Design a protein with these regions (language model features):
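A compositional/biophysical signature of low hydrophobicity enriched in polar/charged and small residues
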Residues: 1-155
Length: 155
């Protein structure tokens, strides 16, 4: 279900996406409102499920996670029990930053962040021991050109 938002809500969301740590006073100033109405709008947006949890963005490379792999998975298994086991394995692995079920020749794509190739191999061995897959292709990202969680709300 799509939640209706007005222009002030949109401006608030743009500011929160830009920097969720800024003060209510700063957000209010930037959107042309005052602190209490902005706080009330943020509260309503949270209650409506538009705003989820807040977190921080860490620099993976600065913390030693230098390898990012995109993992393409094909499976011949489609039973509910296999899928539940596989999805749990993905959710339990902290290396998996994103996991998507796809239409087409590839069944799943994962974004996996690890320290190095040896760590990827350990991840891979653990994954295939938990759930049988038909074919796995790992693609090493040579350079991250853009990475964002911001939605294009402006315009």
């Amino acid at each position: 279900m799509t939640v209706r938002i007005d222009e002030v809500d949109r401006k608030i969301l743009v500011e929160l996406q830009r920097d969720a740590g800024q003060s209510l006073d700063e957000i209010a100033r930037r959107v042309g409102s005052s602190k209490t109405p902005v706080w009330n709008r943020i509260r309503k947006l949270r209650e409506a499920g538009v705003i989820g949890r807040q977190t921080v963005v860490l620099d993976a490379e600065a913390l030693g996670f230098e390898a990012c792999f995109f993992v393409l998975i094909r499976t011949s298994e489609h039973e509910a029990t296999w899928q539940a086991r596989f999805l749990k394995a993905l959710q339990d692995r902290p290396e998996v930053q994103e996991a998507h079920r796809l239409a087409g020749d590839i069944d799943y794509i994962l974004k996996v962040r690890v320290r190095n190739a040896r760590a990827y191999d350990a991840f891979y061995q653990a994954l295939i021991s938990e759930a049988r897959v038909h074919n796995v292709t790992a693609l090493l990202s040579m350079e991250e050109i853009k990475s964002t969680t911001m939605l294009p709300l402006e315009g």
